[in-house]
Amino acid sequence: MSLKNEDQNDLSPKDSVKGNDQYRAPSGIHLEPEEESRNDFWQFEPSNLFRHPRIHLEPQEKSDNNFKKFVIKKLEKSCQCSSTKAKNTIFGFLPVLQWLPKYDLKKNILGDVMSGLIVGILLVPQSIAYSLLAGQEPIYGLYTSFFASLIYFILGTSRHISVGIFGILCLMIGEVVDRELYIAGYDTVHAASNESSLVNQISDKTCDRSCYAIIVGSTVTFVAGVYQVAMGFFQVGFVSVYLSDALLGGFVTGASFTILTSQVKYLLGLSLPRSAGVGSLITTWLHVFRNIRKTNICDLITSLLCLLVLLPTKELNERFKSKLKAPIPVELFVIVAATLASHFGKLNEKYGTSIAGHIPTGFMPPKAPDWNLIPRVAVDAIAIAIIGFAITVSLSEMFAKKHGYTVKANQEMYAIGFCNIIPSFFHCFTTSAALAKTLVKESTGCQTQVSGVMTALVLLLVLLVIAPLFFSLQKSVLGVITIVNLRGALCKFKDLPQMWRISRMDTVIWFVTMLSSALISTEIGLLTGVCFSMFCVILRTQKPKASLLGLVEDSEVFESMSAYKNLQAKSGIKIFRFVAPLYYVNKEYFKSVLYKKTLNPVLVKAAQRKAAKRKIKRETVTPSGIQDEVSVQLSHDPLEFHTIVIDCSAIQFLDTAGIHTLKEVRRDYEAVGIQVLLAQCNPSVRDSLARGEYCKKDEENLLFYSIYEAMTFAEDSQNQKERHIPNGPNFSSD
C-alpha cells in the first residue's frame, strides 16, 4: 500500500499530549488530536491490504576487529618516517607555519591591528583587576595576558577567540592560593593590606607572601596545562560533551556570585581574610556585615562613582555596538582618571585607601614551578583544566562555524595547554578563551591570529613603560571593574522563562549547578552539576515514553494512538513503541508498561492453569472408556489478539539485561499463544540480538525492517492457522 498524497486524511496533532510518545507524524500526513481515550482497540479493520514480499538486506562485510592487529597497524603507521610526514606533523603542531605565509596583508592587516589594539587596551585594566581575584600582584595578570596572546598566535587554529585571563579560572586559582598560603602560615589579613613589594622577593632562605602566592598559582597552572596537553594527546576531548550549555551557564552564574562577593571588601575598603572552601560565599558576607562599621568612606564613594560611569557606558556599548566602530574603552579612562585623582588627592595618605602599590617594569627571571606542591594541587587542577579547555574549544568551534572555517579540537587543547605550561615558568596563572573579549575582537574587524600579536604589543608597552604609573590606583576601582564585567553572567536570570518553556530539565540542571557553585564551592558545584546532569540523562531513559501505535489511513505510517485520533488499529495485532535504549536501568519498566498496555502473560498463564485444574476435576470419560486429555490451550476463552509487534526504531542499543528481557517477554507471551515480532531494529540492535542468540537459525524471520511488513506477516501467518483450524478462534473484541 503506497502513501497517497492527493487524498490525505484530515488528521492533526493532539492539543495536549501528556503522554506516551515523543514522535510526530512525518510531513505530508496530518493527524487530528484525540479528544477522549480509546477503550475499544479494535474499531477498524482495513480491507484489501497489499501483500508485498519480505525485505532482505545483505549486511556489509565487517572489518577485522582483532585488537592485536589493530595495535600493530597503529604502531606501524606512527613509526613510519618520511619527509612528508615530518612536515605535516610540524605544520599540524604549529599552525602558524601554514597560514602566516598565505597572509593577505592588504585585506587583513587593518582589521587585525584595530581589533588587537582595542582588546589590548581592554585587557590592561582587566588583567590588573583579575590579579586580585587570583590572589596575585597586578603585574602577574599583565604577564599572563601577554604570554597567552603570543603562544596562542603560534599554536591556535581559531582566528577570532581572545585567550587570556578569565574570571572564573582566576577565582578557582585564588581559592587554591589562599588555601596554600594558610597552610604555609602566611597572615592573609596582613597580606591584604598595602604592604606589597616585588623587590628582592626571592632570597636564598625566604620567600614573601606575594612570591609564594605566584609559586602556588604557577604550579597549579603548570599541572592544569599538562592535563590539557594529555587530553589532546589521548584525544579525550569528548569529556567536554558532559558539560552541557545549561551546566556551564549555571556554573558561570554561580561562580559569578562568588566573584562578586569576594570583591565587596575592596568596594568598601575593608581588610578581611578571604574565605575559601565550603560555604565561602555565606562566610564572606558574614564577615562583611560584622565589619560594616569599618567601611572606608573614600573607597565607598570611589566605588559608587565608578559604578555610575561604567554601568551606563557598558550598556551603551552593548546597545549601539552595531553603530560603533569600536567599543568605548571606558575601563581605561576610569583607571586613568582614578589613578590621577588618587595620586594628586593623596587619598592613601589622607584616608587610608587601599592601593595597587608598586608595579615593576620589565620581566622577572623565569622560575620553575614548585614540584613539591604538585601532589597538593593536582586534584584542584583537574577542574581548572576541564573548564579552561571546554570554554576554549566551544568558543573556537562557535566562531569558526559562524565565519565558515574549521578548527581542530585536539590542536585547540594543545594550544590552551601550552598557553598554561610555558607561561607557568614566567610567573603566570591559568588562562582560557573569554567570551566578552572574543566578541569585542570579532566586532572590531579581527581577521586572523595576528590580532593577538597586536594585543601582546600593547601589553608589552604597559609592562616596559606604563605599569609603575598605576602605583596610586585604588583597589576599589579594580573591584568595580571586576563586578561590572560579571553583568553578562548575572543577567542570565532573564533567560530562564524561555529556558523553562523549552526544557524544564535543563532549567533544573542550571539551578542546581548555580546554587551548588555559589553556596557550596566552585569545584563541588561543577562536580554536582556533572553528576546531576548524568542523573537526569539516566532518569530520562529510566521511565521513557511508551505507547501503542495505530496505522494512518491510506499509508504505511504508524503513530501513537495516545497522541492522535483517527488511527486504525488492526484486529488481532498490537504494536508497541518504546522510546529509549533497553538496558538494565529500565528493563523492569519496559516489561511493566508493555504488560499494562497489552496484557500480562504471567497472569493469563496462571488463570489458564486454574481453569485447567477445574476442568480436570470435572473430567469425563468417552464411551469407549478412554479418558480425554484436557488441553490447556483450549481451557480458556480466546485472547483478543494473537501478535505483538515491538517497534525498535527508538531503541538505540541493548545490553545483556535488555536482551534477556526481550527473551523473557517473548517466552512469556508465546506460552499463552501470542507471537512477538521485532520491527525496525537498527544494525547495532540486530548485532546485539544475534550475539545474544535471541533468534534461532530458523527464527530469523521474526525480525522485520518495517512495522507494516511485520503486520502483514502476522496477518498471513494467522490466516494460515485459521485455515487449518475449523471455526478458528475469534480475535475481535467483545
UniProtKB/Swiss-Prot annotation:
GO terms for molecular function: bicarbonate transmembrane transporter activity; chloride transmembrane transporter activity; oxalate transmembrane transporter activity; secondary active sulfate transmembrane transporter activity; sulfate transmembrane transporter activity. It comes from Bos taurus (Bovine). N-glycosylated. Glycans are attached at N194. InterPro entries: S04_transporter_CS, SLC26A/SulP_dom, SLC26A/SulP_fam, STAS_dom, STAS_dom_sf. Belongs to the SLC26A/SulP transporter (TC 2.A.53) family. It is found in: Cell membrane; Apical cell membrane. This is Sulfate transporter.
